[in-house]
């Protein structure tokens, strides 16, 4: 009986910590990320408590280490998206610079930097490719942020299990209907796409069919034979005027 009570109290305590850490991280995002996804990094540097609290929590708790707290696919997916965005923020505030590729690693190797998550050491690249992409939901690419202007914007709220599909659809619509990410040139018969569609084409499948699931005010039949070209990727920092 005593063991059952202890286990129950432990479960409640951890679940409460998860809720509190999520709420604090959500408050941080709403305070320091504007509606366009620009981040006030200086504000987070000056007030890092919420981010550090969240990072401290995820060091111990993950869907792998504590599966009983993550009993749906959406709860797992939301967790890993939030974790990815949190550790990218941590990289940026610990290494202020013009862009993420300026951080003291060799080029894209910055994404190999490992963080302790649920007792394991995992990198952003591992989380993206070995966890999130394995979930077979291309919308995750519109929810994770690499601290760069061409990257899908960092939202000013966390992803939550209950509203995850709505949030991911919202992010897909926002990204695809931004002409900086999807632009149709009717004179040249070309569709210009953000380079993430090239990098992760395997996830999206037929690119024209995929974008027209979310693209408004255009007719698929008018452009189905257009060529596809890709914008140059802008790695400059997604920061506000700090």
Which ranges hold each PLM region?
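Sec-dependent N-terminal signal peptides
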Residues: 3-14
